[in-house]
Curated annotation (Swiss-Prot):
GO terms for cellular component: cytosol. Belongs to the pseudouridine synthase TruD family. InterPro entries: PsdUridine_synth_cat_dom_sf, PsdUridine_synth_TruD, PsdUridine_synth_TruD_CS, PsdUridine_synth_TruD_insert, TruD_catalytic, TruD_insert_sf, TruD_pseudoU_synthase. One of its GO terms (molecular function) is RNA binding. The gene is truD. The active site is at 80 (nucleophile). It comes from the Bacteria. Its EC number is 5.4.99.27. This is tRNA pseudouridine synthase D. It comes from Haemophilus influenzae (strain PittEE).
Amino acid sequence: MLEQLPYLALKTPPKTTALLKAECADFIVKEHLGYEMSGDGEFVALYVRKTDCNTLFVGEKLAKFAGVSERNMGYAGLKDRRAVTEQWFCLQMPGMETPDFSQFELDGVEILTVTRHNRKIRTGSLEGNYFDILLRGAEESDELKVRLDFVANFGFPNYFTEQRFGREGHNLTQALRWAQGEIKVKDRKKRSFYLSAARSEIFNLVVAARIAKGATNQVLPNDIVQLAGSHSWFKADEKEDLNALQVRLENQDILLTAPLIGEDILAASDIENEIVNQHSVFDPLMKQERMKAARRPLLMKAKGFSWAFELEGLRLKFYLPAGSYATALVRELVNYTEE
C-alpha cells in the first residue's frame, strides 16, 4: 500500500537500507500535551515510560491497580508498542486518596510522575511528539545526505502510514466492503477505524497525484490552503490572487492541504476532485455516519530536525505535531525493514 506511493526527495526510492525498531530503544517517543498538569483536581495524572507495551493494556492495568473502572481512565493517544514511549494517563478518582503507585509493578513500565489534574486527558488532546530514532545499518553516503538536507529544508509527504490501515490493509478492505453493502458494521470502534482508513487512503492518493504532477509547491486554482500555525483554511478561488498566494506559500505563511473526506466536502483543485470522484463509493457512508470533512497539510516539516551517523547507524531527532507519522519521514530517507 504505502510502497506504491511516490517519493518527494529525489523523486526516487532511497538506496540506503536500514532496520527500524530492531530494538525497542531504537524508537523513542515522548509525548507533548502542550499544557501542564494543574496539580490538583479529581484526576490522578501519571507520566509513564513504557517499553514494548501496548497503551491500552497499560491503562487497563493502572485502572485495575487504582480500583477504578477502565471507563475512568484516559490518555491522549495510542503509542507504538515496539518502542520506548513516554505518555500521560489519568484516572478519575474524586474524593479518593491517590494510590501508592510505588507498589505498582508491570514488566516494561516505569511511573515517572504522579500528580493531580482538574480535567480528563482525552484522546486527541495532544500537541505532538518528540522522536529519537536509530536506523540500524544505515551507512553514510552522498545520496543519503542529500535526502537528509531535503527533508530538513522542504519536509516530507504527510502520508498516513501502515498503522492507519491495519494489518495488510484490513481496515481499508473492510471499509470498501461496508461501502458496497457486503457487510454491516455494528461495533462503533470498527466503524471509526474503517472510516479513518478510507479517508486516509484518499488523502494519500491526492498527495501522490500532486507529487506525480510536480504540484507540491504550487498553488492551483481552487486549492484549499491552510494558514500556517492554525487550523483555519480558505479556498484559492477567483477572489484570490494566485500570484500573491504563491508568494505566501513560498514564505511558509500558508500550507497546501489535501482532503479528509466527509459529508460536506468542498470541490477543490482538478487534481483533488478527480481522486475524490473516483472514490464516490464512500460518499453514502460519510453521510450516514455524519462524518465532517477536514483538511490536512500536504507536506510536513519536522521541527528541530537533526541527525548524526553513529557506529550502529543513523540517529534522527525531531518533533512532529499530532497526527503526523515518523515513518512517513523515515521512508523518504531509507528503505527500511521493521523487525
